[in-house]
Structures are given as structure tokens and as C-alpha cells.
Amino acid sequence: MLSLIKIAAAQTQWPKRDNSKYSRHGVSLSMNINPLLRAYEHGVRRFPRENLQNADLSGFTLISVDFERTNLIGSNLQRTFLTKARLGHCQMNWADLTYAKLNQADLSHADLTKASLYGAFAVKTNFKGAKLSGATLAHANLRGANLEQTNLTGANLFAANLREANFQKADFSWANLQEACLSLANLRDARLWATDLRRAFMKEMDLSALSLHGLAMDGAKLTGSCLRDTNLSHSSLRGANLRGADLTGANLTGVDLTGADLMGANLTQVVWHDAVVEGVNWEEAIADQSMFREGILGLGNHHNHRSHNVHQGRQGLNISCFGGLQAAYVI
């Protein structure tokens, strides 16, 4: 049994480690959380490499605690206050962090495989290099968090607040991002394979040159986003909002834009082969002759053979046609 903690009058400290209680890997073989909590109350903050597997720390206040490289596998941390905590390199597989307060905490390179962070508060938290495959982050607030190079394969981020978060080189393969807010997030070099982005909020994002091939993006909000040279081939964007988006040079081969809103979008140099555009709002959109060269399914329904209003502009000939589409022939 762990010896009782002695609190000296002049200095409070965690008891010296008895190596007989530790494995050859330096991890505690037994851990009673009561001495830990008492030590925390007396100002001790460093508890690195402890064994807290399956420990119940739910609801406790552990602000700025140092659990670096601690074993927290299967631990209960529901509603625990871990603001500014040091949890780097921790083993947290299957841990329950539902509604935990993790704002500005360091979870870099932590293993959170299959962990639950449902509704957790992790604003400006550092998850760099963390493993979050199969984790639940639905309704979590990760605004401004750093998730660079994180493994989010198969993770559930339904309706999560990911605004302004850094996902550079993150892996979202098979992840659920339905209704998630990604506005102003950094997805540079992120992997989005079979990612579900239906009804996701992606306003004013830089998605240029990304591969968004074959994704479910129905109802996504992409207002004002940059999709220059982006590969959207064979993706479904039915009912998506692309108002004012820049799709210059984007690959829309086989894309389904049924009922999408492209008002004011820049569609120059787009590859349209076999794109489906039934019921699209083209008002004030800018396009070029590729709209007429390639096989676009549904575009003909908006075309009539009446004379068009043609005038010479600074960028070339602007032709008002297809129910509001303005095709700019750059010359």
C-alpha cells in the first residue's frame, strides 16, 4: 500500500518513489487516488508516469496538473477540470473525458484511441501528433486547437466546433464531420478520404489544391471559400452553399451539384465533365467557355435560344444566360 503523504511545514512534496512498487518500465504498479488528491490540495502538481488505469477522477479540479506519460487507460475523467494540464504522451485509450475541461491543455502525442471527448471543452488545446482514431468528439469545442499531424481516422466529430483549428497534415479518413464547424480552420495537406462533410460549416476556408474526391458534402456551407484547383471529382454537393466561392480551375468531374447555390461564384477554368447541375442557382456567377464545351447534365434545362445581352467588359465578353449565369469569355 502506498505510504501516507507527509506534508512538511516548510515544503510540500510528493513522497519519494519506492522503486519496488514500479515495473521495469518505470510505471507505478498501484495507485491510490486519495493521496494524489490530497497532495494536489497541498500544492503538488507533478505526478508523471503514474498508473491511473481505470481510475475515477470524474468531477475533480486538477488545473495545471502534470500527468506527463501517465497511464490513464480507461480512466473516468467526466467533467474533470484539466485546464492547462500536461498530458503529453499519456496513454488514454478508452478514457472517458465527456464534458471535461481541457482548455489550453497539452495532449501532444497522447494516445486517445477510442476515447470519449463528447462535449469536451478543448479551446486552444494542443493535440499535435495525438492518436484520436475512433474517438468520439461530437459536440466538443476545439476552437483554435492544434491538431497538426493527428490521427482522426474513423473519429466522430459530429457538430463539433473546430473553428480556427489547425489540422495541417491530419488524417480524417472515414471520419464523421457532419454539421461540424470548420470555418477558418487550416486543412493544408490534410487527408480527407471517405470523410463525411454533410452540412458542415466551411465558410471562408482555404481549400485550394486539396483532394476532396468522392466525398459526401451535401448541404455543406462553403460561402466565400477558396477552392482553386481543388479536386471535387465525383463528390456530392447537393444543396451546398457555394455563394461567392472561388472555384477557379477546380475539378468538378462527375460532381453532383443538384440544387446548389453558386451565386457570385468564380467558375473559370473549371473541369465540368459529366457534372450534374439540376436546379443550380447561377445568379451573378462567373464562368468561361468550358461551361459550353463539356457535358454538363442539367445545364440545358436553363438555356433558351433568345438573344443574350452582350457587352464588352474589362475581362472580355459577358453573356447573361442560363437564368442569371454570367459567362465571362476571357480574351
Swiss-Prot record:
Gene3D superfamilies: E3 ubiquitin-protein ligase SopA. It comes from the Bacteria. The keyword Metal-binding does not apply. Keywords: Repeat. Residues 50-89, 90-129, 140-179, 185-224, 230-269 form the Pentapeptide repeat domain. InterPro entries: 5peptide_repeat. Pfam families: Pentapeptide (PF00805). PANTHER family: THYLAKOID LUMENAL 17.4 KDA PROTEIN, CHLOROPLASTIC. This is Uncharacterized protein slr1152. The lineage of its organism: Bacteria, Bacillati, Cyanobacteriota, Cyanophyceae, Synechococcales.
